[in-house]
Amino acid sequence: MKRINFSRAKQRALRAKRLHVKIRNLQLAANKPVLVITKTNAHIWAQLICYNKNITLASSSSVQLDLQNGNKDNARLVGADIAKKALAQGFKQVIFNKNGAKYHGRIKALADAAREAGLEF
């Protein structure tokens, strides 16, 4: 059988699609909001989304907090901020969705800060 060569971008897109379906199915079954992380080279965003109601419950980003970039220190601030907003609305347990990115660097820093602030995932 002929081996198919996928580009790195195509592989990442397929992996992200698989993970999105898996996370969404888990969230619908568990009735928990999803903490969705999005990052670029310059900034990092975190949103708390309820897929059952299709609404964003809370959001935080390095842009909203007027931080100059999305480095690890600023990712920690975003993680603590989103956790504070989630706890204020009564959500202690969430499902973590990193959008196919590796759990490393800024993603890990944001997740650790959210856990330290009281979120469970």
From Swiss-Prot:
Gene Ontology CC terms: cytosolic large ribosomal subunit
Keywords of the record: Ribonucleoprotein, Ribosomal protein, RNA-binding, rRNA-binding
GO MF entries: 5S rRNA binding; structural constituent of ribosome
Pfam families xref list: Ribosomal_L18p
One GO-annotated biological process of the protein: translation
NCBIfam families named in the record: L18_bact
Its job: This is one of the proteins that bind and probably mediate the attachment of the 5S RNA into the large ribosomal subunit, where it forms part of the central protuberance.
UniProt name for this protein: Large ribosomal subunit protein uL18
Organism listed in the record: Ureaplasma urealyticum serovar 10 (strain ATCC 33699 / Western)
The gene coding this protein: rplR
